[in-house]
């Protein structure tokens, strides 16, 4: 039993390492580009994360999640409070960029 669990853990670790190796982008390890903030490539990495979280793929995933939550609520698998939490969370994720830009604007 313990042998099976340890084999599964080792397998998962190996698969995670292989996935990280395959999907890693060489541009993240490139030299700094000399941005205005002096952080170089860190700005690009953070912007890529924001784009990933609010881009087209994220909108498609959010649409599927809203539909799944709606169906779950309709059939009684999810109560209304959890459905509302899901929708509020999606609103916060997609509204974060606009909220931060309003808070940091000079006007």
From Swiss-Prot:
GO terms for cellular component: cell outer membrane. Keywords: Cell outer membrane, Membrane, Signal, Transmembrane, Transmembrane helix, Transport, Virulence. Its main location: membrane. The chain crosses the membrane at residues 49-71, 83-103. InterPro entries: TrbC/VirB2. It is a multi-pass membrane protein. The keyword ATP-binding does not apply. Homooligomer (Potential). Interacts with the 17 kDa antigen protein that is encoded within the virB locus. Belongs to the virB2 family. This is Type IV secretion system protein virB2. The gene is virB2.
